[in-house]
Amino acid sequence: MAKWVYTFGAGQAEGSAEDRDRLGGKGANLAEMCNLGLPVPPGLTIVTAACNSYLEKGRSMPEGLREQVREGITRMEKITGRVFGDTNRPLLLSVRSGARASMPGMMDTVLNLGLNDQSVHALGHDAGDARFAWDSYRRFIQMYGDVVMGVDHEVFEEVLEDEKARLGHEQDTELSAVEWQHVISRYKEAIEEVLGLPFPQDPEVQLWGAIGAVFSSWMNPRAITYRHLHGIPAGWGTAVNVQAMVFGNLGNSSATGVAFTRNPSTGEKELYGEFLVNAQGEDVVAGIRTPQNITEAARIASGSDKPSLEKLMPEAFAEFEKICNALERHYRDMQDIEFTIERGKLWMLQTRSGKRTAKSALKIAVDMAEEGLISKEEAVARIDPASLDQLLHPTIDPHARRDIIGSGLPASPGAATGEIVFSSDEAVQAVKEGRKVILVRVETSPEDIHGMHAAEGILTTRGGMTSHAAVVARGMGTPCVSGAGSIRVDQRNELLIAASVTLRKGDVITIDGSSGQVLKGEIPMLQPELSGDFGKIMQWADASRRMTVRTNAETPADARAARSFGAEGIGLCRTEHMFFEDDRINVMREMILAEDEAGRRTALAKLLPMQRSDFVELFSIMHGLPVTIRLLDPPLHEFLPKTDEEIAEVARVLTIDPAELRQRVDALHEFNPMLGHRGCRLAISYPEIAEMQARAIFEAAVQAAHDTGAAVVPEIMVPLVGLRAELDYVKARIEAVAKEVIGEAGVNIDYLIGTMIELPRAALRADTIAESADFFSFGTNDLTQTTFGISRDDAALFLATYQQKGIIEQDPFVSLDFEGVGELIQIAAERGRRTKNGLKLGICGEHGGDPASIRFCEEAGLDYVSCSPFRVPIARLAAAQATINGREVAEVQALAAS
């Protein structure tokens, strides 16, 4: 028969901290504390597999579970000298959840289980405090009624508030035993009125009702949401911990509290926490009474006139402080600890690794490494790479009031406040006038780049995490919320229409690009700080990692920002972004609208010095580091005007007939531009465009090498190649231009020509394509689109539904799809290197900044990842963790093999 139950108590436990997967975090740590000889109330843990079995079998308890729980309770009875269900010396229980990953507050708890109309008298007699017994009973009815029976907790709150008002009491603690009895009678009446059922008096019925409720809470909406947000698989299930109750509400020599072994906000090495005298655990969290400081130093710092635990109960405090230090040394991490003091006796109820801010995490990791508790590699592995966003961008003050008017996708982290503007030109003008703005659009296009650059933040009602707005905003480090479908933009009347409010141009909003929230008004911000601890962790990370980290950048500002964050080159320079500046877009349009090659070459001659100067600046900033430049990729219609007003204006500037321009725009329109006339197909149709870009690159390389003294080896990348012949055609044109420039300059130029792998055919035919390529860069944005057959700009319409319904666990445009897209990358890497040993491989899609995707890149043997500038520190840390993890896995495999 399966073993469903593991017991602990009296210094012995069947499990340990190693059994987290089986016993959940809480159960494993209770067992571990027990094995360490710490004062832990006896109990039992029902394994996570029992939860999965219960949910899979239509909420039916697994065979053998009831018998094993009964055996565990018998052991608890022997240790405590109390009997479950007895009316003289009743054993009361707590029933708590405990998943293997910490999910604070997401699942259910029941305390004081086992009380009924008879045993409450025995509890009062035994404790010598009738009021305590009736208070415990009403808490149990309230909790059980809500969690197990499904009666809204507000029903109980209304009864209690009504009774307090009738009696003239302010606090719960003022009610007497008799008064609590009256509240309990009303509670039971309310339950019967709502459900038509009496409150259960049989402790066995109570116990199994509570166990079932905790199992079921694994699938409650808030738990499901939390799992989605934190990447916790639904298949893990939760353990259930059934433990003998100890009471912090047994008078003024009793207390309950929560503490951290270091400050979770700052990371300072100090005992940090709160407690309440004469209270149960949930009172500390509920905020019904103001908690007191644990240490005297904290009390003095806070200015509180209430005594600290250190002063009030010095013996219990001294023991608690000693245990806290021992637990931190044992687990080698900052601990979050729950405790109860029952009539002077200290009991440990929980320990777990404490949640902490990014700033605190850095300090704790660095300090512990320098204290010798952990190694530098362990310190690097302790930091959540995604949390570094908190350090690189302003964030909303967590204590600030939020007036949320809508929400979308957290497309680019950080928070921003400004006046609403509805066009990019307005954004630029407002900034010239010294005003801060949020650019609000249905969706953005490349022509909005000037407004996006000027705005403090960007809000779009359409688009996903890899939409134009999201990608560009991340690259610029500008906060962005995309796909806010609950908000409507009335462009004509310049209105932002939300469910609760309609706002006009000039009204102030705040966007939180880290959560996706859109808020009315100006909200207080916290400014980012990069501490010395950040620098140390990055230094240790760089010493550990194998892959290099480049950036996606095409502007000097982006390139400088990326260098300051530690980028080791440019992995993707999107040359088309350089053509959207005001002084260039019309020259580009002149080229597109030219009637023949001669006309195109005339316009391209005007663009050449512009591109060359851009490349000179990028090469100079990178000072000898690799720079990968992608030739023109998007379809030409993206550069053309769209509305009648825009067409009229462009026709005026180019001195052509608006009707003729409209006709040309319509002729270039494509039904599916993502799969249309773009990438290398443009270079083959109009080779003069690729030739101009190649000349600009080579001339810039010569000049930058002369100016800086650093060797410049440009890497020219041909996009959207599916056939080797396509690459061969474009490569021949590039090499011809290189030969011309070398002859003109009288100096040799080293360069590489490679391709983006962004089509499934290219991945499958990588062996032949590698014969003509010096490097591959995986363009995972398009490779994901073409593998799934999903347009990333439309994906937001249904991918969220897919996640909610469990069809996919992650948005494949945010975190790489390892099974499909990932396999294509592995195939291309293996086949490409089989043809050309040492072929350089990198990734330059948005996945280059995603920690899970970076881990995959390490496993696939890629040489570098490339991401937006503000994600470079995240990628450096994630790449180091991937290397460390890979080394550990290899060591385990080698050990197993021997």
From Swiss-Prot:
Q: What is its EC number?
A: 2.7.9.1
Additional comment? The reaction takes place in three steps, each mediated by a carrier histidine residue located on the surface of the central domain. The two first partial reactions are catalyzed at an active site located on the N-terminal domain, and the third partial reaction is catalyzed at an active site located on the C-terminal domain. For catalytic turnover, the central domain swivels from the concave surface of the N-terminal domain to that of the C-terminal domain.
Q: Which family does it belong to?
A: Belongs to the PEP-utilizing enzyme family.
C-terminal: region residues: 547-898
Cite the InterPro entries for this sequence.
ATP_grasp_subdomain_1, PEP-util_enz_mobile_dom, PEP_util_AS, PEP_util_C, PEP_util_CS, Phosphohistidine_dom_sf, PPDK_AMP/ATP-bd, Pyruvate_phosphate_dikinase
Identify the residues that bind ATP. Answer: 96
What reaction is this protein's catalytic activity? pyruvate + phosphate + ATP = phosphoenolpyruvate + AMP + diphosphate + H(+)
Q: Where is this region: Linker 2?
A: 512-546
List required co-factors. Mg(2+)
Gene3D superfamilies, per the entry: 1.20.80.30, ATP-grasp fold, A domain, ATP-grasp fold, B domain, Phosphoenolpyruvate-binding domains, Phosphohistidine domain, Pyruvate Phosphate Dikinase, domain 2
Q: Which Pfam families does the entry link to?
A: PEP-utilizers, PEP-utilizers_C, PPDK_N
Protein's name according to its UniProt entry: Pyruvate, phosphate dikinase
Region Linker 1, residue ranges: 356-412
Which segments carry the region annotation N-terminal?
A: 1-355
Where in the sequence is Phosphothreonine found?
466
Q: Which residues form the active site?
A: 468, 844
Q: How does it assemble?
A: Homodimer.
How activity is regulated? Activated by light-induced dephosphorylation. Inhibited by dark-induced phosphorylation. Both reactions are catalyzed by PDRP1.
